[in-house]
A protein has these predicted regions:
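Acidic, low-complexity, intrinsically disordered interaction modules
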Residues: 404-422
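FIC/Doc superfamily catalytic core
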Residues: 1-400, 412, 428-434, 440-444
Length: 444
């Protein structure tokens, strides 16, 4: 546990309102017994994820990381109320990573700056973190020196008091008052010493502590939350010993922002026992790993498909449309949908689709239907013979296909709501559903 001692007096514990007002406040405590199960779950999921990723080639791994980083950047900003264009972020990341065949959308200078910060942290996870580095990252978030129309201090620690408030003007509620600006330099020196040190505790706990500690210091006038999430990711990367990042916590925090802020506030008003915060953080990370599994499944299924049809001649439009649906675009493949998305005539769409049917790349879901829809043929072999006990279940608002593969491997894959609905209605055959979500199991 952290044992950083102070060299100046603070309030006695009885009169302290915020955690940083207590003497030796960074000697955080937690109940290891209460955390054992969730930490084991996270470690198990990390192992499974990286085990699956071992079957991917370098290019596929790079694409998986790019997709993860895209949503990390987007959702970390959205937590702070900043909406970024997903295509611009994806394009910026792809260009910086040297990934081809990604829709090119010219990103703004701001998005390029934010992406550069994330990639710097990811690519140099094992380097010493310095005051100069973290100040440069904060400055990159605010290239104009303004935030929400107000000029702020950038590239340096704050020199003003920092109050975390909510509510209308005149009716503000103060949630937290950060350490005084006179303390920030020394507080951050203590934090950076700890961050760069080696400590024999769980990487998940270290990541959670870094997040909590940094936002509690609140060293900058703005950008603290985004930086805290980057720093916690860096510690996870150090533990993984890999610059490849395939999961992030930002997307899950964004779905539960109120709980995120409430549990931070509770810990910041506490006595140094941050068990509840660490548990919430680890549980949120566990959900993030589930999300990463879904992304990896999509990439593996897509890779399996293109291996099968690599020698089949296709037009660029057909390739682009197939990639769109392989990436999980939620719509039935019909001539109307095809024409709309490909921006071509319906007659052209019909010819494209019929050509793919003739080449055994698409097949009708219900042969002879008045308004035909189609599914991608991932594998010409009927893979239903390899599965038993297939069910569609709903959990926490998501739909999953569950089955037993070859009588020995339990499979659970999240599926699109539209596919679940179509399957229940009988519009989507089981063979097509299993092929779409479970073909990766056929990779030898």
């Amino acid at each position: 546990m952290s044992q950083i001692l102070r060299r100046y007096p603070l309030l006695n514990d009885a009169s302290a309102m915020y955690i940083h007002e207590k003497d030796n406040w960074t000697a955080f405590r937690w109940n290891a017994t209460e955390l054992t199960a969730i930490l084991e779950e996270v470690n198990r999921k990390q192992g499974l994820l990286y085990g699956r990723l071992s079957s991917l080639g370098f290019d596929s791994k790079l694409k998986a990381m790019a997709e993860n980083l895209t949503y990390d950047v987007v959702y970390s900003s959205e937590i702070e109320g900043i909406r970024l264009n997903v295509d611009e972020v994806r394009s910026s990341i792809a260009r910086k990573l040297g990934i081809e065949n990604v829709k090119q959308t010219a990103p703004s200078h701001y998005i390029d700056s934010v992406v550069a910060v994330m990639l710097d942290a990811v690519n140099h996870y094992d380097q010493i973190l310095t005051k100069e580095k973290i100040c440069a990252w904060q400055a990159a978030f605010f290239p104009t020196g303004f935030s929400e129309g107000s000029q702020i201090e950038v590239g340096q620690y704050r020199t003003n008091e920092e109050h975390i408030v909510s509510g209308m003007f005149g009716r503000e509620k103060i949630h937290y008052i950060a350490p005084s600006p006179e303390r920030v330099d020394e507080e951050m020196a203590h934090f950076l010493d700890w961050f760069n040190s080696q400590e024999n505790i769980s990487s998940v706990i270290r990541s959670a502590i870094a997040h909590f500690w940094f936002v509690s210091i609140h060293p900058f006038e703005d950008g603290n939350g985004r930086l805290a999430r980057i720093l916690s990711d860096m510690l996870l990367a150090r533990a993984d010993k890999s610059e490849f990042r395939f999961y992030n916590i930002s997307s899950q925090i964004n779905k539960d922002k109120n709980r995120y802020y409430n549990i931070l506030e509770k810990a910041q008003h506490g006595d140094g026992d941050i068990t509840e915060w660490i548990y919430w953080y680890a549980n949120t990370l566990s959900v993030a790993l589930d999300e990463a599994e879904n992304i990896v499944s999509t990439i593996l299924n897509k890779s399996f498909f293109w291996q099968k049809v690599s020698s089949v001649p296709l037009s660029q439009r057909q390739t682009d449309m197939l990639n769109l649906f392989l990436d999980g675009y939620e719509a039935k493949i019909t001539s109307k949908t095809w024409a709309s998305l490909a921006k071509c005539s319906k007659d052209t769409a019909i010819r494209d689709i019929q050509d793919l049917v003739d080449k055994d790349i698409l097949r009708e879901d219900i042969p002879g239907a008045k308004r035909p829809s189609y599914s991608i043929i991932y594998d010409p072999e009927d893979i239903t013979v390899f599965f038993s006990d297939v069910t569609i279940e709903q959990q926490n608002g998501n739909h999953y296909i569950k089955a037993m593969y070859k009588g020995r491997l339990k499979v659970c894959e999240r599926i699109l709501p539209l596919d679940a609905e179509r399957f229940e209605k009988g519009d989507l055959p089981l063979e097509n559903l299993l092929a779409k979500y479970c073909s990766y199991l056929r990779i030898s």
